[in-house]
Amino acid sequence: MRTLAALLLALALGACTPVFFQPSSTLYATPGLYGIDYQPVEFKAKDGTGLFAWYLPARGHAIGSVLYLHGNAENISTHFANVAWMPAAGYNVLALDYRGYGGSDGRPTLAGIQMDIDAAMQALISRPDVDPNRVVVFGQSLGGALAIYYVAHSQYRSHIRAVIADSAFADYRLVAQEKLADVPLTWPLQWLPKFTVDNDYSPRAAVAALAPIPLLLIHGERDSIVPPHHSQILYDLAHEPKALWTIPDAGHIGALRQAAVRKRLAEYLAQEEQNGVRSNFPTAAR
């Protein structure tokens, strides 16, 4: 998450959930600039909002597919490097720009973005080169929070092998309160998020409903944006199967910059693919 000063000021003035969204329509880079094969993809959300994504096909035989949900700032052109290694590891990747981000239309809201993720999931599993029963949802920062809530309530739960949340916060109000408390000037205003921040899509309230879908939480021990205790909160509330990796010397969404962590994650993904489709999935959490 960026522009902390803007977040604090907006909260102090009584603004609400939109401060979590810092989109940009600027195209900063493309996978092609780095020799990575990709395809622009366009589709629509249920409410008709036009959405944009990049599809990065696996090199050779695909082990599975990943729906990637980026953080709160800019767009996929500044985040795709976090998953650029996955095609070489055998995974197709669909990287979504939420409404209002990058090439997608509309204005970001939590409710709208949940529709966007649902449309992206449908687009991914409908592709002829994708096994619809081998999908992992991977989100970072805001994307991790979105992923947890989405999968807990998704109509496509039976297609999802695992949820991975890197540097996710546990609760919208909690992280806003903590940011206000970090600064002496806004410390007295910690009560504001209780009344100004929409918490209907809180990952903390949804995480227990993920099971039996496996949950992997990743958090850098040096994350000063979303402190590691947020992943610990989510881990404590989640049911098995679950795992929490705390990564030394990693900051916010910085764990996957380490080759050892990427290798470990590739091994985790391969293991979840081998586990097969689990039986008795509910169609959605209620």
Regions found by a protein language model. Give the residues of each.
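Alpha/beta-hydrolase fold nucleophile elbow
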Residues: D129-S141
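Short beta-strand/loop motif that positions the catalytic acidic residue
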Residues: L210-A211, L216-H219, D223
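Alpha/beta-hydrolase active-site loop
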Residues: P108-P128
